[in-house]
Design a protein with these regions (language model features):
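Glycine-rich beta-strand-centered segment in the early N-terminal region that forms part
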Residues: 38-62, 73-120
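NAD(P)H dinucleotide-binding glycine-rich loop of Rossmann-like/cofactor-binding domains
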Residues: 78-80, 89, 114-188
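C-terminal hydrophobic helical "lid"/dimerization subdomain
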Residues: 9, 315-387
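Residue-level marker of beta-strand positions
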Residues: 90-92, 110, 138, 183, ...
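Mid-domain Rossmann-like dinucleotide-binding core that forms the NAD(H)/NADP(H) cofactor-binding site
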Residues: 156-236
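N-terminal Rossmann-fold cofactor-binding loop
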Residues: 211-215, 252, 313
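Glycine-rich cofactor phosphate-binding loops and adjacent beta1-alpha1 units
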Residues: 176-179, 209, 219-306, 372, ...
């Protein structure tokens, strides 16, 4: 099948690789290519494969974390002698073959990753993401790091679901809001993870207040029925009327929003964050020089208000199961911005990582998908894409 990869500069004329264009990222030029990758050999009876599954990826998506990982891996390609580099961590795949000890899946099943963390899903396995190389098209993954895609979910929806939904469910569970109730606020609310958080909170009956750095369009508001929205521009403070108004704050980027969150939270409130915006020095988009001062002010406010500050990485298998169950009940989510074909790889990468107007996940189709799949690509100019 056709695989999408970033190609090493000295391999651009290599036979068998079709160069699709390039993307400039952090002063580095990433060349994107397509190549035929044959089905790997897989003997399910060998000890190395008994607990594993061979997958053919039907669609995949990138997460925010993948941008820094791709850059790190690219900068090491020459040292490691790599000709090309796949990328992407969310996927919907078809089971092609299973190991002799695998009883949970069979050929033809559709699966997505289970990114359970911090507890490993089986002895000897590392917790966390199932792959960082979904664009390769063929994956060999331990069965314990997979879960079945429900029949109600399209391939495109499944490819955009697991990591964000599992993280959001983990953050909500660990915040304690389901037990205590409360008035939640979501920072950077148009980010992919925040959209999952908002949808899940709405599903539980909450009316989250969603803050983003620019105005909301009517189309975007329709994706979050029952939520209230507002604007919190970078470098500004929340409106005085919102100070000490909320019981729980959910934030994907603590390096942007921690101080604002401490102002928004009431005494005894809870702040939960799952990461930071600037994850790679070459891709750090103007982190304020005064960020250390802002952090000090934020922690001082947390002390005065007796706030609980929690970090959260991914979620447990039960969190993903909870999110999948909610989807099957409501058919709500995930928010998908655009769907791309392999020849649109440059536009896909730009939209996934560098388009401030993106709303939801971008999905790349690698193989045939369900007739009911979401296919609503936006037509837009991507000025930073160069072919």
């Amino acid at each position: 099948m056709k695989s999408l990869v970033v190609v090493a500069p000295d391999q651009l004329h290599r036979k068998g690789i079709d160069i699709l264009g390039h993307v400039d990222a952090g002063g580095t030029r990433l060349h994107l290519g397509q190549l035929d990758f044959p089905q790997p050999d897989f003997d399910g009876k060998t000890p190395a494969n008994r607990e594993h599954v061979l997958l053919r990826v039907r669609a995949f998506a990138c997460n925010f974390r993948d941008k820094g990982i791709l850059m790190d891996n690219y900068l090491q390609m020459d040292r490691l002698g790599k000709a090309y580099l796949p990328f992407g961590s969310d996927f919907c795949a078809e089971v092609v073959a299973v190991g002799s000890n695998v009883t949970t899946f069979r050929a033809g099943d559709r699966v997505m990753g289970d990114f359970a963390y911090p507890n490993a899903p089986a002895p000897g396995l590392l917790p966390g993401v199932a792959t960082n190389f979904a664009s390769l098209g063929w994956l060999r993954i331990h069965a314990a790091k997979l879960t079945t895609v429900p029949p109600e979910m399209s391939d495109h929806q499944a490819a955009a679901f697991a990591l964000g939904a599992q993280t959001a469910a983990g953050m909500i569970r660990r915040s304690g809001i389901l037990e205590s109730g409360g008035n939640p606020v979501i920072l950077s609310a148009r980010s992919a993870t925040s959209l999952f958080i908002a949808q899940q909170l709405i599903g539980y009956g909450f009316r989250p207040h969603c803050l983003s750095s620019s105005e909301w369009s009517s189309e975007q508001l329709q994706a979050l029925p029952g939520a209230t929205t507002g604007v919190l521009r970078p470098g500004t403070f929340p409106a005085q009327a919102d100070h000490s108004k909320f019981t729980h704050a959910f934030d994907p980027f603590f390096d942007m929003n921690l101080e604002a969150a401490t102002l928004l939270l009431a005494n005894g409130g809870t702040y939960v964050t799952c990461g930071l915006r600037d994850q790679h020095p070459l891709l750090s988009d103007g982190t304020p020089e005064e960020s250390g001062v802002a952090l000090r002010r934020a922690l001082a406010m947390a002390v005065v208000k007796n706030l609980s500050v929690k970090g959260n990485c991914l979620g447990e298998s039960s969190d993903l199961a909870e999110a999948l169950g909610a989807f099957c009940d409501t058919r709500v989510g995930p928010v998908i911005d655009s769907v791309f074909e392999p020849q649109e790889a440059v536009a896909f990468l730009v939209s996934s990582f560098f388009d401030p107007g993106r709303f939801g996940k971008c999905v790349m189709t690698l193989a045939s998908v369900n007739p009911g799949a979401v296919t609503t690509p936006r037509t837009k100019a991507l000025a930073t894409a160069t072919v």
